[in-house]
């Protein structure tokens, strides 16, 4: 049986743990946007058939999640020993005589008898129920002082192995996708996208990194402190980048993005990697006036004064199959919209978040509110009546009928089209309108109104809601 440890001699189930440096090896990470990290380490440590015990450097280890992907190896126990603090060193020094450095370089020696309650024996044989004042000096012994966390792992191998393959789930590293779209007047946009990794726990040196996009349930809170993981998480040798952009694959109900080349990042130092080459996409712009009805609940009477309504600006990027942008699934993230001014400088004109978008599905985002397109809505009529003879099993049946006038003003020199939408859960309908409504779904209808440049347009409609 082979053993290696930095802690000294240990006995466990008849296995001797002999002193040696912790084993290192290749590291790869799968980073999830919620902060979880799957850490995989292939360690240059041979396993003999049967029981093996080793000391490993496993940064951010949650022992409960440790396992071996090798079908011939099982983890039978794992003990995480954090970096040594002063109290732990004092406990390990019980029975030892330590030197305590006091003010102006003075020293005093005392034997540690107990830490809680504190008891020390002085050189004259007297016992003191406290520690001597000053800072204790400890011998630099591996069995006494650990400068970083280490894990003592017991493995059962059904056959000898040349390396040790381990994996576990940690936390403290997140990633987000941010996209930039430079929109032009011709209806075409140039789109780029990148992933930014932020670490509050791991310092990674030359590791293979994958980013995972998808909705993964979380049922368990990691118990060990993230601070214990603030050490190097990888020792793989540097290699030339495989490609300039991430490659993508489907695993279960997630999409996994392999970043090119070995990746290194430090705590608190964000790293950005491109997700795909620059792509061109056609787009359309929409102006949308949201409806007056609540999604659920009572449609109330409004003031007779006109009510200013924000006009939302939406962009839809076409992502047909067979196009460079359409064949690529997009991890959910933030889309930043830019447009060039008269001098050719790009200006930020909108920003929106969106969810994971599969290949072939158009991307629709709301960039903000219009500046030169405005809307006012006024309630011109309102009636509420009780409907006799309600259906069996229902209480009082109320019908609300309300009429509205929406005035659209376009300060742009060119003509535009504005959507006025209404959506509501339940039994409702449009009984009269100055423009034909279009039914988008069982709960939403819209009016499409052309508005001339530097001009106005008016819509009137009546809604009937039964509740």
Regions found by a protein language model. Give the residues of each.
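Long, intrinsically disordered, low-complexity accessory segments associated with secretion
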Residues: 3-5, 11-467
């Amino acid at each position: 049986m082979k053993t290696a440890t930095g802690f000294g001699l240990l006995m466990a189930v008849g296995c001797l743990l002999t002193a040696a440096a912790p084993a290192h090896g290749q590291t790869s990470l799968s980073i999830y946007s919620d902060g979880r990290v799957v850490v995989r380490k292939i360690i240059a440590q041979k396993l003999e058939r049967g029981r093996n015990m080793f000391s490993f450097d496993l940064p951010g280890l949650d022992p409960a999640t440790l396992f071996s992907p090798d079908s011939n190896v099982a983890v039978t126990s794992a003990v995480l020993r954090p970096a040594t603090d002063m109290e732990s060193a004092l406990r390990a020094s019980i029975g030892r005589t330590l030197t305590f450095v006091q003010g102006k370089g003075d020293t005093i020696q005392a034997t540690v008898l107990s830490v809680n309650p504190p008891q020390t024996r002085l050189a004259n044989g007297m016992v003191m129920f406290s520690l001597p004042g000053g800072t204790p000096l400890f011998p630099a012994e591996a069995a006494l002082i650990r400068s970083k966390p280490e894990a003592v792992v017991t493995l059962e191998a059904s056959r000898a192995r040349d390396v040790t393959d381990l994996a576990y789930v940690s936390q403290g590293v997140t990633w987000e996708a941010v996209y930039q779209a430079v929109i032009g007047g011709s209806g075409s946009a140039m789109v780029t996208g990148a992933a930014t990794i932020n670490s509050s726990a791991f310092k990674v040196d030359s590791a293979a990194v994958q980013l995972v996009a998808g909705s993964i349930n979380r049922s368990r809170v990691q118990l060990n402190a993230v601070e214990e993981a603030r050490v190097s998480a990888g020792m793989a040798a540097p290699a030339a980048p495989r490609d300039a952009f991430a490659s993508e694959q489907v695993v279960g109900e997630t999409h996994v993005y392999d970043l090119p080349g070995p990746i290194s990042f430090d705590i608190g130092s964000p790293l950005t990697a491109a997700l795909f080459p620059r792509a061109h996409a056609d787009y359309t712009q929409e102006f949308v006036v949201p409806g007056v009805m609540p999604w659920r609940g009572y449609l109330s009477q409004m003031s007779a004064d006109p009510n200013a309504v924000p006009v939302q600006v939406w962009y839809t990027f076409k992502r047909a199959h067979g196009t460079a942008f359409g064949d690529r699934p997009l991890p959910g993230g933030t889309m930043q919209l830019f447009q060039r001014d008269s001098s050719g400088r790009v200006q930020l004109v909108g920003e929106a978040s969106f969810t994971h978008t599969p290949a072939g599905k158009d991307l629709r985002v709301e960039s903000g509110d219009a500046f030169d397109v405005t809307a006012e809505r006024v309630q011109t009529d309102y009636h509420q009546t009780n409907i006799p003879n309600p259906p069996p099993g229902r209480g009082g049946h109320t019908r609300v009928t309300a009429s509205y006038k929406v005035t659209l003003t376009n300060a742009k020199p060119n003509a535009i089209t504005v959507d006025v939408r209404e959506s509501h859960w339940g039994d409702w309908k449009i009984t009269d309108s100055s423009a034909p409504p279009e039914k988008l779904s069982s709960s939403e209808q819209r009016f499409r109104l052309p508005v001339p440049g530097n001009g106005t347009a008016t819509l009137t409609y009546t809604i009937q809601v039964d509740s």
